[in-house]
Every structure is written in C-alpha cells, then in structure tokens.
C-alpha cells in the first residue's frame, strides 16, 4: 500500500513538471569579422544571450568589426570561411553542421575551408 502511494505521488510530480523542465539547455555561438577574418566562439553557456556575448567578446580581442553570426542549442556549430565570404550553420552533429556550412560558404566564396567547429556538451 505504501509503495502504491509513493508511485502515485511520483507520477503526480512528473505530470506537474514536464521532462523539459529537467532537461539542461546548453548554448553555443560564433562571432565573426568578415573584414578582418577573425572569429570568436563560446560553448556550453546557460543562455543564448550569454553565449553570444562571450563569442563577441572573444572575437573582439583580435578584431574590431565582429558581429554575432550563429547561435545553437544542444547542438554543433560550424564556421567555414573563404576569401570572399563565409558560411555558419548548426546541426545535431558535427558532420552535418560542417556540410551545411560548407554549402553556405560555397554560394559566397571559392576555396572554402573549415575554420572552427564546436559542439555543446550532451545535456544531462
């Protein structure tokens, strides 16, 4: 009887607090200066805003014209650059993020190459 009551209480708690409330969201971001060809990144921040701020600050250590170009949540981001442009994309895994960024860069530039790729830690 006590076990049944405990199970019912546990089910009630789980119903009141959806699984999303227990999931940890981790954010990453890239900032880039197309003029100066410098980038900054941030990974595993608790909010999008914090990740973007950190990426911009990281980029601004080496360049003056940095802008936030990509953010991602519980995923991977890739920055691909070429002489005339860049591509920045995200996906659930590194391979797909890189492939998407390569394709985006190829529409703007020749000789695109992977500049950076990072993935957030797996959510707990």
Identify the function of each model-found stretch.
Residues 2-9, 21-124:
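Helix-coil modules at protein/domain termini and other flexible surface or pore-lining loops
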Residues 15-21:
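Sec-dependent, cleavable N-terminal signal peptides
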